[in-house]
Regions:
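Thiamine diphosphate
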Residues: 1-153
Length: 153
């Protein structure tokens, strides 16, 4: 990663700590009040600390939370594909776990909301989001069958 103007990345060493993105982003926003903070998390991962959206909203922290929505728990899908011959249970809408409605969640926590469905929308929507100092919840729809790489299970 290359960051301009002294930007930094804060993450877990393995980039695999579910639920860590929101607490880290809050800490960064409080420590560096003048800077904008970007938080990237998954649609399953955010469920572990979703209450932190209230903290972000209450203190009007300049955090843009990007939720990568692939319609389920991709790491669990990978585990089930590798060790259970692709027999899936409770990893996506089709197997018993519904995806959250992030637009309603943003409204409930009094956050601005933006939806990115296509690559062609990214530049224009990012310009709008990044030019605003309000906290945002940004849902980014991705391919539910996208392969993930990294730690093997």
């Amino acid at each position: 990663w290359h960051f301009n103007n002294g930007g930094k990345e804060i993450s877990s060493g393995a980039n695999a700590a579910m639920g860590l993105s929101l607490p880290l982003s809050i800490g960064a926003a409080v420590a560096e009040k003048k800077n904008q903070v970007l938080s990237v998390t998954g649609d399953g991962s955010i469920e572990l600390n979703i209450q932190e959206l209230k903290t972000i909203s209450h203190y009007k922290l300049n955090i843009k939370t990007f939720v990568i929505n692939n319609g389920g728990y991709v790491s669990m899908k990978k585990w089930q594909d590798n060790f259970f011959a692709g027999n899936r249970l409770d990893t996506e809408d089709l197997t018993g776990v519904g995806t959250l409605n992030f637009k309603k969640i943003a409204k409930a926590f009094d956050l601005k909301y933006e939806l990115i469905k296509r690559e062609s929308e990214i530049n224009s929507k990012l310009s709008k989001i990044m030019s605003n100092e309000s906290p945002y919840l940004v849902e980014v729809i991705t391919d539910p069958n996208q392969k993930i790489y990294g730690k093997e299970f």
